[in-house]
Amino acid sequence: MLKLIIYLRPAARYFLIAWLLTIIIVSSIPNIPTLKIHTAGKEIRLDYLMHFCEYGVLTFMAFLSIVGKEFKIHFRKVLLIAAGLIMFAILDELHQKLIPGRSYNIKDMMSNVTGIMVVTVFTVVLFRMIKDKIVQEK
């Protein structure tokens, strides 16, 4: 897994751009039905999980696209990227108010932000592991 991440790092910017465009395009489609699982007397919405994963992938791609070969990342960059991604998530939800059949949903936005925060922590820990492995191999 670590070797795959190291291998994909040089192309991460292209993946990031593609993922950003995908988010913008999909969030601009009018009248998308909400995916739900119906259980005995309960309905579970899958769109919150999808928002979490969508912004988790975006976060990982953003960090992978800016990190160098040594996988060192400064705390200031972590904060700036996380803040930028949160702003993008908010703007993405707000822009949906302009799309017919779509609306601003605070729960969607919270799922986006939660995905960003969880994957930010995961990525920082993962990059430290990769950095330590690179140092050991030298």
Regions found by a protein language model. Give the residues of each.
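Membrane-interfacial alpha-helical segments at the cytosolic side of multi-pass membrane proteins
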Residues: 53-69, 114-130
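Short, charged juxtamembrane terminal tails flanking transmembrane helices
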Residues: 3, 133-138
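Membrane-helix interface segments
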Residues: 10-14, 71-80, 105-106
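"…centered on the first transmembrane helix and the immediately adjacent amphipathic helix/loop
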Residues: 1-65, 81
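Juxtamembrane helix-capping/reentrant segments at transmembrane boundaries
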Residues: 41-46, 74-75, 107, 111
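Interfacial helix-loop-helix junctions of multi-pass membrane proteins
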Residues: 33, 37-38, 90-113
